[in-house]
Amino acid sequence: MPSNIIERVSTETGIPRLFPALAGEIALSDMQSLLMHAYKSRTANFGESDLRRGAERSLVASSKVNARLLNQFDRTAYEVANEFEAVELSPVGPLGMNHILGGIDQNNVLTTIRNAEVLGDPTTALALECWRRRKNQARDAGRETVRLCCSQRLVRMQPFDEPGYTPHFRLFALVSAGRDTGSHAFEIRHLGEHIRFYLRLFTALNDRGFSFRQPLVEISDTAVVEALLGASGIGLQEMRQSIRAHVLGGSERFLAERGVRLPEAIDDPERELPAGIPPFRLARLKTELIDKLRREFPDAQFRFNLARLEGLSYYRGVCLRISPMAPDGNRYPVTDGGLTDWTARLLENRKERLLATGVGTEFVCVKYRA
């Protein structure tokens, strides 16, 4: 439905069907031409005062983080991610990409007048690259996993309540795309590769002026969390309307307000889950991955967190979050990721799997300098 602004503009211009025309009746190519000419006409009368006003917006301000520090992070990350092919993404993607794949509200995306949009999530663009490559592999009967990584500056238009968050920021992301081979083998193998990358990255950065201590690795499973919520009488729609991914502590507040307690820290899903809730793939993850990682990284902590609600409508299956101790004594969830159905949808093949994870470069450079 059109907003009050649309209704007011329609009334003032005397064009009653303005919104339906813009929303779908005009072809995208025609609307692109229309908007291009409109903005060209407007900017023809712009001057220095207009530039000064525009330059006050946080959207166009430069990052407050030293560029050399960001580049140092990127160099280290690319060195550690030597098993992943490094790609340089376009700063824009197809119109609707962030919403269709990432579930980002279109109002929170910087949409261009040329029927494209600025990246709001690097993993959606990487998913499209995986789709291209997996599509070609299918023609050639190829079955190799596609492993990609990138560093990307993103733009998100939503208001941020947390100090330190800005409309544009840099992330380093990894994706692994391949075929389900049964027995959760894809999830176990590639989740392990991603976790190892981040823990090794933190170690490497510790030698370069950063301080990451006792990283807490939390594994969750959306299927288990959905079952627990259902048993508590909470619908997914109610949860999705209340939880915002960029607001810290959202899960805790949502559950506390409803008097619901979900298992936040468990070690053995088969023994510790409530009766009637199947562990799905978590039991295999414990024996085939988590127990090995505990021996490999004795300074890190590992647990299953089934009280995590952020990402429940974003991921499909196993997801992870890593929160190292920062120099200020707090833990911040700097790494997030999980399994998605994006390549399965794009390739129209339910056996396709995509693991997408990322680390907040800019946030790390602010909070984790020694």
What residues fall within each predicted segment?
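Positively charged, Gly/Ser-enriched RNA/tRNA-binding surfaces
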Residues: K64-P94, L101, I113-F210, L216-V217, ...
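TRNA-binding/sensing appendages of the translation machinery
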Residues: M1-L119
